[in-house]
Amino acid sequence: MPYQPANSGGTSGGSKAAAKMAQLKFWNKQNSSKQQQQDKDKDAADGGNNTSGGGTGSNSNGDAKSEAKNGKRNWLHTPEQLISGHAVYLVKFFGNLSVDQPKGIEVVKEAIRKLQFAQQMKKAETGTQEKFKKLEITISIKGVAIQEPRTHKILHQFPLYNISYCADEKGVKKFFSFIAKTVKTQDGSDPTSNGHANGNGDGSAKVEESHECFVFISNKLASDITLTIGQAFDLAYRKYMDSTEKTNLSKAQQQINHLQQTVNVYKERLREVSAKLPKAELDALLFNLGIKDILEAPTTEPQNGIEVASEALSNGKLDDDKLLIDTNSTTASTHSASPSSFLPIVPPRNNLSSQISIGGKSNSQKMDELLLNSDSDSDFDPRADETQEIGGTGRSAISNMFGFEPANSFGQHLFSNNNDHKLQNNNSSLLITSNNNSINSSGFSSELNITPPLLAPPPKIAAPRRLNSVTTGNGLNGNTDLFGSDPFELNNGPNIFKQNQLNLDDFSLESLDPLRK
């Protein structure tokens, strides 16, 4: 029940008004609490809480991840302020002590507990609360400095690359801390102001590196200080990357200029040396190298296979070294499968053997075959056109009126044996040539499979003069050998003449002429 003044009289109207006011206050308080809860939930969902740590090692990892995922950060200062100037915060220095680890929220909590315990011990000894010293923290992309507000005396100064962790304690909002690397000399002197030892230059003093945790108290700006240090780290990293790219570009340009100067010096020396050589030797050297000038150098620009092929076709010339198909290599199909080369499809290997055996002969082999099949005196046959195939085997029967076959010449013997062997073993030769290994050893198989050239057909084998079966009155067949199987055998011939079965008028001397048909 709200407080009522004494002069109100306790009227009913006053009591009703007081009750309504109390009810309105209760509703306003309840609505305000609901609105605050909704605002907190919204900030947690959006990840835009400005009190989250933005340093190198903030303990609010969830908020930092959500901000990085959204691709934006709620920085407190403009980039120009931290690049050209600095941000200053007034804080209370709680203390500092050495730590074992360079980062971690548990390391920071342990350091805060130790400092609090030390403060309680001093209070118990002296009986009075120690006052904390007020200091200024100056933050920029160059580093973090701790100085006195009035005298601006720098007590501690650390570059950003020496700060390994920065966080504000969420449990206790007023604590802010960071871990930095310090350098001390072995004789126990104070750490240097910039994190590096002030050596004498002789290298006699030994240094010792350690990590210290600095803790500060700020009732309202602890999270802002952490976020400002995080922004300084981000700007410093971007500046470092930009400067590194420019430095690398300048170094590359310097190297290019140095190489150009070196090439010019070498060209001048080469021109002087070539001037001392005889002109004949210089021309021979240029001809062997395929260049017109001694200072000419081949271009090293990469060209794809399509451009090379188009240039070759447009010029109408195709070098032997740039053949599209290499039939002498078994890796032709492998090269043709690569997408970088513009090569046609390789024909099947089973047909390649016949193509090689027919069309792949050298000029020397063709000339030898032409000379072998030429119409010489030994190969001349007046009855070359009288050929008849018997039994479909491709072999011609030769029968002379004297009963024996003349000896074949060297060319007839060669082509007759080759044709018989090829016709009888047609199927087997196709199976053998289908193997890829036989293609590789075609030097020996091609000599065995020699076929007659197209321009000089092989000489035809003479056919018998009398092909019709004629039976004489004496019972003799027209194809019968009148002199027997052997013309020089005396046992066959005289029997015929004794029986008077053959008269001299049956044939004349002109019929015995081998040049007449």
UniProtKB/Swiss-Prot annotation:
PROSITE patterns: PID. Residues 185-197 have a biased composition (Polar residues). Residues 83-265 form the PID domain. The modification Phosphothreonine is found at T480. SUPFAM superfamilies: PH domain-like. One of its GO terms (biological process) is neuron remodeling. Residues 1-70, 185-205, 374-393 are annotated as: Disordered. Disruption phenotype: Embryonic hemocytes display a reduced level of apoptotic cell phagocytosis. Larval hemocytes display reduced bacterial phagocytosis. RNAi-mediated knockdown in muscle leads to an increase in the number of ghost synaptic boutons but does not affect the deposition of presynaptic debris while RNAi-mediated knockdown in glia leads to a significant increase in presynaptic debris deposition but does not affect the number of ghost boutons. The keyword Ribonucleoprotein does not apply. It is found in: Cytoplasm. Its main location: cytoplasm. Keywords: Cytoplasm, Developmental protein, Phagocytosis, Phosphoprotein. InterPro entries: Adapter_Engulfment-Domain, PH-like_dom_sf, PTB/PI_dom. Belongs to the ced-6 family. Plays a role in axon pruning in larval mushroom body neurons during metamorphosis. Plays a role in the infiltration of glial cell processes into mushroom body lobes and the subsequent engulfment of degenerating axon branches. Involved in Drpr-mediated phagocytosis of apoptotic cells. Required for bacterial phagocytosis. During neuromuscular junction development, required for the clearance of pruned ghost boutons and presynaptic debris and for normal synaptic growth. This is PTB domain-containing adapter protein ced-6.
